[in-house]
Amino acid sequence: INAPLKERRMAGLVVEPGERFQPNETMNLRLKGPKDSLTRLRANDLRLRLDESSVQKGAGGRWTARVLVEGLPQGVIRLGSVPRVDVRRGSP
């Protein structure tokens, strides 16, 4: 299939908290894929989950975790490095 490709930025996406950690911020994603798929894609279609097994203490004592992106339509890819977000310990 020779569909025209398009790039799209989605800003302010909410990351679901894990059992022990919560994200400090929202995420921005860069996506690339068929124009019709990206045009129809809404923030509600995506699920961004905190990967608690990847929590690391970074520079300056900040804790970060990898974010798993689920729900991308077929043919749509995420551009850039693996998304990470600053986290804090959740309330018990």
Where are these regions (language model features)?
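Structured interface patches
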Residues: 1-92
